[in-house]
Amino acid sequence: MPSTPPKAKWTPMSVADALGLRALVLLKDRQFCILSGVLLLAMIPLQWYMNYCSVYLDEVKFTYLSATYNLGTAAELGFMLLLPLMFKKMSFKSIMLIGLGALVFRYACFSAAAISGIRAFDLGAILIHGLIFGIVIVGVQLHAAELAPPELRNQAQGYVMTLSAGVGNLLSVALFGFLVLPLFKVSDKLHDWTVPYLISFGLAVLAMILFAVLYKAPKKLDNK
């Protein structure tokens, strides 16, 4: 974990500090902008899983739901333990491509399950969650803190969380909750999930391609 020294003692905490907004100065770097854009794009399908997966699994009568989520939690713990080793042995770009590839795999599985009705695809999509979360959110936090100057490291991590859990979540709810799902509602309690999952798959593929083509690891950033 990178060193993230706190603000000076007795310095008042502001809203900008809490949301990591002081790290916006880092956006002057083109590669940091690209990373932010890819993260935001990836958050739309990732937060879609967080918000609506339980609704989907309930509608399709997925059995052993609690046990499956417990397996997903165990897998997440395993992937999180592997993350520091990955950072030691691999470049950030390679690690991020693995995470985005896992996001693509998830929505390929969900799309296949929605089309075929084979619930084993849903199981695979759930178990991969730890790898996606560990890399695409936690991994980007660590990388952003490594790039930032010491006085902005905690701000950089806060910025990543605001972008992912805040802005990304709002965009996901706006797209799927207010636009896509209502269009594919087949009854009061049922939806046709095929197109929403194909849209998520397409967004994940786009995020992966953009990152692979555009991102080059920047040198250490400063706030000047």
Task: Map each language-model feature to its residues.
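Multi-pass alpha-helical transporter architecture, strongest
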Residues: 1-2, 198-224
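Intracellular juxtamembrane helix-capping segments at the cytosolic ends
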Residues: 135-149
